[in-house]
């Protein structure tokens, strides 16, 4: 399972950037998911009805994995460990990482700087 981060879905919506082709490829393969946090980030950033409609069409094709107790607990462990090491990645990325770890699969992202710090998290390649 490939789990798309916010940045690559934005690339896809814009039709450019490193993530656009990767998202298109994974959509074609039919095993692309995202997280409830990414869904929140995309929808909270809408600036018009048209943009919201476009995002909703994409989200209809990309199921969002929910944050359940196990994902929240895993995210808390991720955040605590990284902050203790002085390498925090913020709450949203901690929740995304916790969700990916909980459900398995690999995260498709351009943000390797943050997500490569998370022990056990598999990063999908963009090419």
Task: Mark where each language-model region is.
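Active-site neighborhoods of divalent-metal-dependent phosphate/nucleic-acid chemistry enzymes
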Residues: 62-110
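Alpha-helix capping/helix-boundary segments
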Residues: 8-9, 38, 71, 95-96, ...
